[in-house]
Amino acid sequence: MIDFNEYKTYFDTYAARYDKADGRVALKIVHTYAVVSVMETLCRLRCLPPHTAGLALLCALFHDIGRFEQLKQYDTFLDHKSVDHASLSCKVLRENHVLDRLPETDREAVLTAIENHNKLRIDPTVTAAASSCPDDAQSLGAPGPCCSAGEVLELCRLIRDADKCDIFRVFATDDMTDVVGASEEEISRETITPEVMEALRKHASVDRRARKTHLDQWISFLCFVFDLNYRESIQIVKEQGYYKKPFARTDFKDPAAKALVREALEAVDLYMETFGETIPGALREFFQAPPKMA
């Protein structure tokens, strides 16, 4: 049985080493517990077995633990200007032996999910390993040597979804300079790179190498919707509505950019509508009284 509170205490102690007066540090602490909250909801709604749910919560708690050292060393959260933060998170966990009490297969499953949480797509070897299992071993908790591969893939999907769900909240409510490195006033004068808009039209994630402007990053956030794996995740994003708010409060100066923003929002709305109109009762209850983030 995984003692989540023990790991939570470790995270709190580790994060306390860094300067909370820096809004970016506080942002990541709040984000971590918000992702944990979303993960709890996804696990409950998907009726995951306790073992898988326990590992999923560890993925949520530690997925961004490398962010603190990234900020300390490079003074930025931008991976392309510093280091891959998922890889750094895994390095921190390994070097500090944080997960050593877990069985090796569980430890490696958590690390694999964390390593994959920020990538453009899940490592094909992870997907291939799961798909090579017999159908009767695909269900989580099923006996046999193949079920662990299916569980690893499930953990990858869960942490990618939970992280993206809360990134929309961060996008809408935190200081934009902390989030993307530019103010909303600066972004209002920017344009959207054609390659970024093309990715959105194809319902694809945006390769960070294609981004040229901060507004490109905003569009990249919208494209997260297309990479969500579960209907429950789509409904969380749709119901909270955070994805729209920065666009709604920004007066874009360039007419072409304004038109493209409108097109992008309409495309995302239409995509989410295809996942159905009915919000499950348990999910409605979550929105009425969301769990505490810390």
For the regions a language model picked out, list residue spans one by one.
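Acidic/His-rich, divalent-metal-binding segments that scaffold phosphate/diphosphate chemistry
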Residues: M1-S87, A294
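Alpha-helix initiation and N-capping motif
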Residues: F4-K8, R107, V152
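Hydrophobic/aromatic-rich structural module bridging two neighboring secondary-structure elements via a short loop
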Residues: F68-A109, E115, K119-R121, G144
